[in-house]
């Protein structure tokens, strides 16, 4: 489920690159405008289709029978929400910024990976252009790294869910992406084409993954649906703001090598990995402290979230997604 939130980022790079090449080869003078119009129209159509088809909740899911709806409700009260389909309260939602004290750390991690993510998704063609190929081949060469990135996105997301762990998964993958930026900053990729192109694969392998894992991480530790709604919208928005930073480091003044841009992306990526590990270690420490205080051995998921209405203030609360 979490992987579906970001797979579009990878696949969009594949489709748009192929679309641009096809239109350009068709000798259309406004190929850029056509590509953007077609991509935008497809996005709007799918969004409208989702609005019409997708149910508002599991209870309204027309494709589930009564038994399946009951199972869905059980899973949500067991592992997701303190109260399912609760009435929206703006005061309750805003209180998240006062009571959920870890949100600034989530935000900082989002800042760090956001610069890397938007640099890859927006400027990968400029990076690959350093290999020395023409426009058409450069666009085609962006397809393979994005496909590999999509595959790793699915695999790592499933792994993260299977092990119920977020911290190490985020840190490892963003580190891989950062190493790719270090390679690009340290070598002349027009003279070392294979190494440079491999570094582009490293960017896509690790660059897209932190986004869905981070969103899942703070949602896993926010059982109140009102607080979850406001935190999700706020943290996603603040992470997306980092697109402004990426657009101001990949500039004509730093072309064609973009060495400083690569160094900045790598630095923020490594910082995000350190913050992710720090948060993971804190959750491990706090869970162990709570177990010692109670003389029990509990982990996240042992206590139904329906019984944890006070969140981390509850004595039996255990953080989910930290280092095991």
Regions found by a protein language model. Give the residues of each.
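Intracellular juxtamembrane helix-capping segments at the cytosolic ends
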Residues: 1, 9-11, 209-224
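Interfacial helix-cap and linker-helix signal at transmembrane-aqueous boundaries
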Residues: 4-8, 12-27, 128-129, 159-164, ...
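Paired intracellular helix-loop junctions of major facilitator superfamily
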Residues: 23-24, 28, 189, 217-229, ...
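Cytoplasmic loop-to-transmembrane helix junctions
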Residues: 31, 137, 227-234
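Intracellular terminal tails of multi-pass secondary transporters
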Residues: 51-86, 257-324
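Extracytoplasmic gate region of multi-pass secondary transporters
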Residues: 91-158, 211, 215-216, 229, ...
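Cytoplasmic membrane-interface "Motif A"-like loop-to-helix N-cap segments
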Residues: 161-175, 193, 226
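C-terminal ends and interior cores of transmembrane alpha-helices
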Residues: 172-189
